[in-house]
């Protein structure tokens, strides 16, 4: 815990950090968010308040799933923060359906469901496609509230991406057909296998069918399958067990979008000058301490960013500017006279925003 917390709504997300060394007590293989195949990792759970300010961080073994980290956060909030009524905001990986049912008695949650679950609810006629609109809609099923919306901009973006992929695969098939015609001894089976692999990689195999016809690859778009695949483009569904009296649908939507602040903190930890990597440690307690210190630095950076927000300068640029402030020390015998250099220009503004004044007095320090 980094500071005293009085709120009852918290944002929570999980990330991983790969390790270059060996024999770390927490290292293990797991779902690697850094896309580093063959690397062991640690899993990090970050808890922030509703403004995105870090309040606690936990480190888990590298093979820990997102949902398995939730009980630890509940214990933290209940026992350390002494919060009786807890509302936790997390993505859909945090709260699988089975866990939502178990947690309903312990905490309130705001999360989301995937397209597979949405399709199931549509099939069971518990939801209707007409509810997915630019304006937020709400449905309550078995004391769980479902907040629905369709982002038209995202719908157009996905449709455009899919069209670009279809155009790309069409060009690749034409190139492959040209090669087959120019090389009579080349294998059509190999060519078909390569195109199939490309279709799967681009996730077009659900609605594009291919076959060999007279040493030429033919493809056809299954319009019905394409329509089904694109039906939920831009659509999403949030879920919560909060009462309407506690939060309306607009508030639920806004709080879920606030998760981006936690993601920003993770990027700051992993990709900026704070440098959580590389981890030159093996013991569990030291690894956790390393992540904790990095998280405290992230908290300080966030506060500095708030104080310096109207100076049109990044935190790193501000810190670099402050490194020019030095003390002048004059030694006379066994005595030392130290005078702080006065801040001017940008440094004066930076310190002023932090309500820090450098004394003009000359201090005498005697040494023995």
Locate the predicted segments by residue.
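Anion-binding and metal-coordination hotspots
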Residues: 1-368
């Amino acid at each position: 815990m980094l500071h005293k917390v009085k709120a009852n709504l918290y944002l929570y997300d999980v990330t991983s950090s790969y390790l270059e060394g060996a024999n770390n007590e927490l290292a293990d293989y797991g779902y690697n968010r850094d896309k580093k195949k063959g690397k062991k990792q640690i899993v990090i759970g970050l808890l922030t308040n509703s403004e995105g300010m870090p309040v606690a961080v936990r480190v888990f073994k590298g093979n820990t799933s997102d949902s398995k980290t939730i009980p630890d956060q509940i214990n933290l909030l209940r026992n350390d923060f002494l919060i009786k009524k807890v509302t936790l905001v997390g993505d859909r990986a945090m709260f699988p359906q089975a866990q939502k049912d178990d947690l309903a008695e312990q905490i309130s949650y705001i999360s989301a469901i995937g397209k597979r679950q949405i399709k199931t609810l549509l099939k069971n006629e518990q939801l209707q496609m007409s509810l997915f609109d630019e304006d937020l809609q709400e449905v309550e099923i078995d004391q769980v509230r479902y907040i629905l919306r369709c982002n038209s901009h995202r719908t157009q973006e996905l449709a455009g991406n899919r069209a670009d992929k279809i155009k790309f695969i069409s060009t690749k098939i034409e190139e492959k057909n040209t090669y087959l015609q120019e090389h009579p001894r080349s294998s059509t089976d190999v060519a078909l296998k390569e195109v199939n692999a490309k279709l799967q990689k681009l996730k077009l195999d659900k609605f594009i069918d291919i076959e060999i016809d007279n040493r030429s690859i033919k493809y056809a778009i299954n319009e019905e399958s394409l329509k089904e695949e694109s039906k939920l483009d831009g659509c999403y569904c949030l879920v919560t067990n909060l009462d309407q009296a506690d939060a309306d649908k607009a508030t639920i939507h806004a709080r879920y979008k606030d998760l981006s602040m936690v993601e920003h903190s993770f990027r700051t930890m992993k990709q900026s000058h704070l440098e959580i990597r590389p981890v030159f440690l093996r013991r569990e307690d030291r690894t956790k301490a390393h992540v904790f210190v990095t998280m405290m630095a992230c908290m300080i950076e966030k506060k500095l960013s708030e104080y310096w927000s109207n100076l049109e300068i990044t935190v790193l640029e501000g810190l670099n500017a402050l490194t020019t402030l030095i003390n002048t020390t004059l030694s006379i015998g066994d005595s030392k006279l130290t005078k702080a250099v006065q801040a001017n220009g940008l440094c004066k503004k930076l310190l002023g925003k932090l309500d820090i004044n450098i004394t003009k007095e000359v201090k005498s320090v005697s040494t023995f």
